[in-house]
Structure formats: structure tokens, C-alpha cells
Amino acid sequence: MNPLDLIAKRAYPYETEKRDKTYLALNENPFPFPEDLVDEVFRRLNSDALRIYYDSPDEELIEKILSYLDTDFLSKNNVSVGNGADEIIYVMMLMFDRSVFFPPTYSCYRIFAKAVGAKFLEVPLTKDLRIPEVNVGEGDVVFIPNPNNPTGHVFEREEIERILKTGAFVALDEAYYEFHGESYVDFLKKYENLAVIRTFSKAFSLAAQRVGYVVASEKFIDAYNRVRLPFNVSYVSQMFAKVALDHREIFEERTKFIVEERERMKSALREMGYRITDSRGNFVFVFMEKEEKERLLEHLRTKNVAVRSFREGVRITIGKREENDMILRELEVFK
């Protein structure tokens, strides 16, 4: 078979809808990156640095990430960066023999595994959304988003540690950490078969800049840096990340608002009679049967609103207050 035909058969592109609507589908931050911080980024840029292949990761960025992590057991050799958390995930699929994940989960795990031709195993979460018993070991990388995406619920420490004890490598995807506030990065004191992945896309309003980072053992970081592309995160993107960390209090205040809105929406949806998860992300998840879900999606299309559809239901990003009020009104009308 022609290699291009093979790729077309096994892989598929990540597609999004047009942005000519109220868009609550991709868990983007509803607040723009502050204009004064954009100005600061451009004041701090060195025009001469634009002509060179700039260091990635930038040592200054690594130091700021370490400060943000606020631990006493990590050093600069425990951190690297990626062109978004997605690149880190993609590269890890090249590093291990088999990728394992538990749907409903982040859809790109499957997309990336098929794109790179990786062996992968999908084992659904249990009915109560817990990690199932699974036969894994050395050579496997197990991807676990925590809080989970798309459901937003949190896995218990015991569930994560059960997988760590098998010897399989665990990629703990903490993309939504800031909206939950609890991390399992301390497992790195005990386990070398763990990498914690985070992103600047969600809480820091920098999805377009594509900056993620990974925290792991020195041995893993050394291997990752050998496999990833050189100069993988641009000078400008790294500067945006550094400025964001220098002004983290702005983003912490915004995150507080998003969390308050999430809890308000969860309370309202429960009162309406919807079955939802206890989401700890910047979104809510509503369980629905296929027929009801399709009717809701059509109803929202007539109102020019986009949410994300999954087999188990719909995921709704927390937006600005007026957007959240609007979606609640439409869900009440639909009910």
C-alpha cells in the first residue's frame, strides 16, 4: 500500500468548528491574555534573538517553572518543555512500546497513537469512572489525565499508585491542575516511572502559543530531550510563558472566577435534573443518551452555540458569566 494511503487510512486530523458562534467546546480560557502583559512580552524580546535557533528549553523559563512547582526535591534536570503538552504526549508515544489509556479520556491519545503507528490498548473506565484492573508493565506508557478529560473527575492517589507499582510508565496529564489545585507531582520522590505533564494553554490563556512542560526523573528528561525535536518551543512562546509566571497572581484570580462559575453551573444543572460529574476542570460534563444528546446539539446549533460531543454526553467549557448564563437558560428550556 502507498504510504500516503496508509496514513490516510489509520490517522485522522483534529478538526474544530468555525468560530462564528459562542464557542464552548475546547476548554479555552474565556479571558484574553492581558494587553499590558502582551506589551511587556514585546518590550522584553531581543530582536537579535529572533535570528538564532533559540535554546529550548530556556534556562530562565525552567527556573520559573521550578519556582511555580514550589518543591524542595526537583532541579532543572527534572524539567523540560514541549510545543504544547500535546508534543510531549506525542513524543512519549515514540519512546515506549505500547500506549495505554482509559476512555472516556483525552481524544488526542488515540489520534496520536494512530498517527505514529504506535501499539495501543484502550480499556474503558469502570461504570463509576475508576481506573480498571489492567495488565501493564515495563515498556508500556499509561496516560492518565487528572482531572480527567472529558469528565473532569479526579482519580484517587491509590489508583495512580496501583499503576505505578506495576512498573509501567505513567504519564500523568495535569493540564487542568490549576482548576483543581491538587497535584500528584510528589509521587516523583518515590517513583521514577512517572512524568507529570502540564500546559500554559488553560489557566494562563496561552493556547495559541503552544507551551507545555514535563516534570520527571533526570533519566526520563534526558531521554525525552534526545527524542524531541530541537528548538521545539519558540523564543517568543517561551517569553510569553515567562511573563505569565511573573504575573501568576492575575491568572490565579481568573482561575478563582472560573472555579466559582463551574460550581455555580454544577449546582444549577443538578437542580434542573441533569446527571453530571463532579468536575474539577474548567468545564462541566453532562451524561446523556445518544438520542437526547443529538437533540440538544441540534437545539444549541439553532442558538449558534458549540459544545463538545462525546459518546457518553456533552462537555461544556466554562465561559464568561454571560455565556454561562445563556447556556444554562438553553439547557433549562431544553429540559
From Swiss-Prot:
Record's keyword annotation contains Disulfide bond: no
Pathway noted in the entry: Amino-acid biosynthesis; L-histidine biosynthesis; L-histidine from 5-phospho-alpha-D-ribose 1-diphosphate: step 7/9
Pfam short name (any one): Aminotran_1_2
Reaction catalyzed: L-histidinol phosphate + 2-oxoglutarate = 3-(imidazol-4-yl)-2-oxopropyl phosphate + L-glutamate
Record key words, sorted: Amino-acid biosynthesis, Aminotransferase, Histidine biosynthesis, Pyridoxal phosphate, Transferase
Tree of life domain: Bacteria
Enzyme Commission (EC) number: 2.6.1.9
Cofactor needs: pyridoxal 5'-phosphate
MF terms in GO: histidinol-phosphate transaminase activity; protein homodimerization activity; pyridoxal phosphate binding
Location of N6-(pyridoxal phosphate)lysine modifications: 202
InterPro entries in the record: Aminotrans_II_pyridoxalP_BS, Aminotransferase_I/II_large, HisP_aminotrans, HistidinolP_aminotransfase, PyrdxlP-dep_Trfase, PyrdxlP-dep_Trfase_major, PyrdxlP-dep_Trfase_small
Annotated GO biological process: L-histidine biosynthetic process
EC primary class: transferase
Stated family: Belongs to the class-II pyridoxal-phosphate-dependent aminotransferase family. Histidinol-phosphate aminotransferase subfamily.
Subunit structure: Homodimer.
Protein name: Histidinol-phosphate aminotransferase
Protein encoded by which gene: hisC
